[in-house]
């Protein structure tokens, strides 16, 4: 079976506070994008995984394997193996949720085959990664907590152009940079105001509320990202440009319907 694992951008992303479990509370506006990985998957006598191009992480550390193992543990359906071929189109470490999208696609495949409830599948996804719960369904949603507290909204119809940059940014490192510089970090905008502005083609309000807190640390580490974003903001017809996730992918929103 051929699965499409659609990525996401964060139209708004702020880090609100650090949690006792060493994670962070975030506030974000998730938006699905057309860009996706392709996954060819079938049940098999033995576990087989291959990727084009080859990944720079081992299978044991792959979030797809984590999703399969977590599914087996949580459901008790553990007497199966999968043959998976991943065509990796979304950039690694790019902020588009590529690995999480792959995990979500495989979970949806397993859920349909083993008839797992939506509630149970959601709970499994929360154990795998912060973006996985949203990517199970996709569309447009406000995310809170670690990203797993979701408020799905009427999907926005946006023209989003993606600009992958040649930096594999470590999310953990970016959170550490935020923590180290917390007192000097600025927070502004509102994801609900941004959503309404994009829904109603209110360009001025959209510009005022589009925000990614990670730009304040990522742009110091990678100055070329800042320069590229500033160049993009000069483009004709643009509503706003932003970095997605903890980086490094940049994107621009051209118009909203």
Swiss-Prot record:
Pathway terms, separated by semicolons: Isoprenoid biosynthesis; isopentenyl diphosphate biosynthesis via DXP pathway; isopentenyl diphosphate from 1-deoxy-D-xylulose 5-phosphate: step 3/6
Active site: 8, 131
Enzymatic class: transferase
Matches recorded under Gene3D superfamilies: 3.30.230.10, GHMP kinase, C-terminal domain (3.30.70.890)
Keyword S-adenosyl-L-methionine belongs to the record: no
Catalytic activity: 4-CDP-2-C-methyl-D-erythritol + ATP = 4-CDP-2-C-methyl-D-erythritol 2-phosphate + ADP + H(+)
UniProt cross-references to InterPro entries, sorted A to Z: GHMP_kinase_C_dom, GHMP_kinase_C_sf, GHMP_kinase_N_dom, IspE, Ribosomal_Su5_D2-typ_SF, Ribsml_uS5_D2-typ_fold_subgr
One GO MF term attached to the UniProt entry: ATP binding
GO BP annotation list: isopentenyl diphosphate biosynthetic process, methylerythritol 4-phosphate pathway; terpenoid biosynthetic process
Residues that hold ATP according to the record: 91-101
SUPFAM superfamilies assigned: GHMP Kinase, C-terminal domain (SSF55060), Ribosomal protein S5 domain 2-like (SSF54211)
UniProt key word ATP-binding: yes
Key words, A-Z: ATP-binding, Isoprene biosynthesis, Kinase, Nucleotide-binding, Transferase
Superkingdom of origin: Bacteria
EC number assigned by the record: 2.7.1.148
Pfam families registered for this protein in UniProt: GHMP_kinases_C, GHMP_kinases_N
Sequence similarity: Belongs to the GHMP kinase family. IspE subfamily.
Cross-referenced HAMAP family: IspE
Function, as annotated: Catalyzes the phosphorylation of the position 2 hydroxy group of 4-diphosphocytidyl-2C-methyl-D-erythritol.
Name this polypeptide is given: 4-diphosphocytidyl-2-C-methyl-D-erythritol kinase
Upper classification of the organism: Bacteria, Thermotogati, Thermotogota, Thermotogae, Petrotogales
């Amino acid at each position: 079976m051929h699965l499409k694992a659609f990525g996401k951008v964060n139209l708004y992303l702020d880090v609100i506070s650090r949690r006792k479990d060493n994670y962070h509370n975030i506030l974000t506006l998730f938006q699905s994008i057309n860009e996706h990985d392709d996954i060819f998957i079938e049940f098999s006598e033995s576990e087989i995984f291959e990727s084009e191009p080859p990944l720079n992480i081992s299978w044991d550390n792959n979030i797809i394997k984590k999703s399969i193992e977590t599914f087996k543990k949580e459901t008790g359906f553990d007497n199966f193996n999968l043959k998976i071929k991943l065509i990796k189109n979304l950039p690694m470490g790019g902020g588009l949720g590529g690995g999480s999208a792959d995990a979500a696609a495989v979970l949806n495949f397993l859920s349909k085959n083993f008839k797992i409830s939506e509630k149970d599948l959601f709970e499994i996804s929360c154990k795998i990664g912060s973006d996985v719960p949203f990517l199970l369904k996709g569309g447009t949603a406000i995310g809170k907590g670690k990203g797993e507290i979701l408020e799905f909204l009427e999907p926005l119809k946006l023209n989003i152009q993606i600009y992958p940059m040649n930096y594999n940014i470590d999310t953990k490192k970016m959170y550490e940079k935020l923590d180290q510089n917390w007192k000097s970090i600025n927070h502004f905008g509102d994801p609900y105001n941004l959503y309404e502005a994009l829904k109603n083609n209110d360009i001025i309000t959209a510009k005022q509320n589009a925000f990614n807190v990670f730009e304040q640390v990522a742009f110091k580490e990678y100055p070329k990202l800042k320069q590229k974003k500033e160049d993009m903001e000069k483009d004709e017809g643009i509503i706003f440009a932003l970095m997605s996730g903890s980086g490094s992918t940049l994107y621009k929103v051209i118009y909203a319907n």
